[in-house]
């Protein structure tokens, strides 16, 4: 495993999970996903040095997520595989094609450790569920705060009202993260 801080590294902090897609008259299909995980994957596919600070288990789903990410060059930060189980987003597709979602989430990512004297990441990206779901949201905010002066900070709110809790509290978190960011999607 590596640690964040290689020159030109993109550090993405956020959820990696399994989308369980259920269609009428078909067996459920597991697909590795998560908005921040997909950003790390896209950066790696573009040839960028990408690290993902996430929270997955060592269960079969977690192993599938790790394998999926590592196949394209994404590295997980130390401690990212500490969850008791890997989170899921179950999408049930109705006969009309509309989806309904049920989330089973655990979000307690480790603070990404750095080697003494290591260069800060060029880019720090977060968003979606990771930025708002306690207790891990506090780690996300600390990472953005700590790297704000040395890295380009990118934030994608990707608002999901059903997961964000009380609107005023969620809005306050989003506003703090926007203020820490150089780029907001």
Regions found by a protein language model. Give the residues of each.
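Conserved beta-alpha-beta core of the PfkB/ribokinase-like small-molecule kinase fold
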Residues: 123-185
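Short catalytic helix/loop segments, enriched in acidic residues and glycine
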Residues: 26-42
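Structured loop/turn residues at beta-strand edges in well-structured enzyme cores
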Residues: 5, 119, 179
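Short beta-strand/turn micro-motifs composed of small residues
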Residues: 14, 54-56, 157
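Conserved alpha-helical elements of sugar-nucleotide-dependent glycosyltransferases
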Residues: 34-35, 61, 139
């Amino acid at each position: 495993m590596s640690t964040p801080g290689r020159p030109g590294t993109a550090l993405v902090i956020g959820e990696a999970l399994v989308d369980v897609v259920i269609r009428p008259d078909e067996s459920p299909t597991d697909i590795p996903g998560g908005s921040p995980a997909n950003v790390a994957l896209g950066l790696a596919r573009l040839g960028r040095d990408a690290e993902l600070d996430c929270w997955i288990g060592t269960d079969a789903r977690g192993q599938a997520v790790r394998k999926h990410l590592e196949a394209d060059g994404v590295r997980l930060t130390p401690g990212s595989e500490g969850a008791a189980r890997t989170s899921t987003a179950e999408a049930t597709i109705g006969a009309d094609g509309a989806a309904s979602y049920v989330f089973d989430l655990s979000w307690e990512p480790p603070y990404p450790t750095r080697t003494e004297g290591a260069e800060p990441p060029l880019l720090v990206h977060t968003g979606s569920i990771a930025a708002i779901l306690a207790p891990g949201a506090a780690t996300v905010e600390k990472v953005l705060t700590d790297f704000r002066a040395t890295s380009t900070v990118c934030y994608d709110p990707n608002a999901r009202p059903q997961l964000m809790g009380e609107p005023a509290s969620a809005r306050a978190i989003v506003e703090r993260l926007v203020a820490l960011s150089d780029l907001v999607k």
